[in-house]
C-alpha cells in the first residue's frame, strides 16, 4: 500500500512540476513579447476590406510594440486557406488572423474543414462592423421593404436577386429576408460582388445587397433605388435610409464584421496585451474616420465578448445556410 501511495505522490509531483514549468515558460514569453516581427494573415486580396483593416491596425500596432507588423495575403477557398494556416501556427502571438464574418459560413458549406473557428482560435477583439444596402432596379415597383415583400408574396419565386455565391453576405441577407418574411425569391449567383451589383443596375436581377460604398454612387446617379440597410441601426453614411428592421421586419440584422484572432492556447497575457492595443487603436478619432469612409463602424470588445459573438454568428449562419440547402463541396 505504501509503495502505491509513494508512486501516486511521485506522479502528482511530476504533474505539478510540468504545469509549473509550462506556466513559467508562458509567463516568460508574455513578459518579453514581442521579440520579433508579427504577421497578420488575410484570406482576401490586397485592396479588400479585410486587407485595409489589417494594414491600418497593423501599422499602428507596430508603433506600440516596437516591432514590424507584416500583412500577408493568403487568398483562396473563401478565406479558409488563411484560416487553416493560422490555426496550425505556434500559439506565441507572432501570427494572427484577420477574420471576417464570412468565415462563419464555411463550416456549413464545407464538410472537411481542418479547423474549428471556436476550438482552434483565441479571440482578440472585434475591429469593425459593416452593413449592406438593399437596392432594387428602378423598374421594380417597390419604394420600400414592405412593398418588396408584398410583391414577393404576390408572385412566389418570380423575384430574383444577385449574390456573390453561397455563404456570401447577399446570400445570407436574402435567406434571412425569406425566412422572416415567409417569401420565396430566386438566387442568381455571380463570381463576385461587383458582378452581382452590375446585374442589378442592368436589370438582370430585381435586387441585390451591395456594400454602402458600392451603393452610394449608384443611388446618387439614379441607377438603383435604395430601400434599406441590413444592419440593426442606420448607417452613418446613409442616415436617411431606414433599416430593414424598421421597414417591416423587426429584429432583422445581417451585418458583417472584422476582427483579430490568435491560435488557440496563445498565452492569456499576450491576448490581453493585443486586445488593449487594438481597442486603443480602433477607438481613436482617426481610425473612426478612416473606417467611416469605407462604410464601416469602428467597434471593439473583450476577448470573451468576441468569442460569444463568433459562437452566435456560427449558430445563426449555419441555420440560414441549411435553410437554403447550399453547399460548396
Model-derived regions, located:
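N-terminal secretory signal peptides that target proteins for export/translocation
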Residues: 1-10
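Bacterial N-terminal signal peptides
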Residues: 12-25
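N-terminal (or domain-start) structured segment
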Residues: 28-119, 158, 182-211, 218, ...
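An extracytoplasmic/periplasmic, membrane-proximal ligand-sensing/linker region
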Residues: 35-37, 180-183, 268-329
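Hinge/capping helix and adjacent helix->loop/strand transition within the periplasmic-binding protein
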Residues: 88-93, 108-195, 244, 257-290
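Beta->alpha turn/N-cap motifs
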Residues: 98-103, 163, 193, 210-215, ...
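Short beta-strand->loop
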Residues: 114-126, 162, 184-188, 206-207, ...
Amino acid at each position: 500500500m505504501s509503495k502505491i501511495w509513494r508512486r501516486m505522490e511521485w506522479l502528482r509531483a511530476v504533474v505539478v512540476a510540468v504545469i509549473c514549468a509550462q506556466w513559467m515558460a508562458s509567463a516568460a514569453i508574455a513578459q518579453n513579447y514581442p521579440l520579433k516581427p508579427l504577421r497578420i494573415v488575410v484570406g482576401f486580396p490586397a485592396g479588400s476590406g479585410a486587407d485595409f483593416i489589417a494594414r491600418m491596425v497593423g501599422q499602428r500596432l507596430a508603433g506600440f510594440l516596437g516591432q514590424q507588423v507584416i500583412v500577408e495575403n493568403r487568398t483562396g477557398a473563401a478565406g479558409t486557406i488563411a484560416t487553416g494556416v493560422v490555426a496550425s501556427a505556434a500559439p506565441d502571438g507572432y501570427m494572427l488572423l484577420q477574420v471576417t464574418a464570412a468565415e462563419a459560413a464555411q463550416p456549413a458549406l464545407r464538410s472537411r474543414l481542418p479547423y474549428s473557428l471556436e476550438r482552434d482560435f483565441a479571440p482578440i477583439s472585434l475591429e469593425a462592423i459593416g452593413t449592406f444596402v438593399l437596392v432594387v432596379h428602378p423598374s421594380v415597383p417597390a419604394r420600400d421593404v414592405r412593398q418588396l415583400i408584398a410583391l414577393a408574396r404576390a408572385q412566389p419565386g418570380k423575384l430574383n436577386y444577385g449574390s456573390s455565391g453561397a455563404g456570401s453576405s447577399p446570400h445570407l441577407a436574402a435567406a434571412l429576408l425569406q425566412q422572416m418574411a415567409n417569401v420565396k425569391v430566386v438566387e442568381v449567383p455571380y463570381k463576385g460582388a461587383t458582378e452581382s451589383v452590375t446585374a442589378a443596375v442592368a436589370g438582370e436581377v430585381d435586387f441585390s445587397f451591395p456594400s454602402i460604398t458600392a451603393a452610394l454612387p449608384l443611388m446618387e446617379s439614379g441607377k438603383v433605388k435604395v430601400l434599406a440597410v441590413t444592419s440593426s441601426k442606420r448607417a452613418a453614411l446613409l442616415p436617411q435610409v431606414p433599416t430593414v428592421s424598421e421597414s417591416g421586419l423587426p429584429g432583422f440584422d445581417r451585418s458583417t464584421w472584422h476582427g483579430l484572432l490568435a491560435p488557440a492556447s496563445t498565452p492569456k497575457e499576450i491576448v490581453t496585451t493585443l486586445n488593449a492595443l487594438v481597442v486603443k487603436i480602433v477607438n481613436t478619432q482617426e481610425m473612426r474616420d478612416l473606417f467611416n469612409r469605407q462604410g464601416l463602424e469602428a467597434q471593439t470588445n473583450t476577448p470573451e465578448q468576441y468569442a460569444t459573438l463568433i459562437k452566435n454568428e456560427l449558430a445563426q449562419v449555419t441555420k440560414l445556410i441549411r435553410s437554403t440547402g447550399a453547399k460548396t463541396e
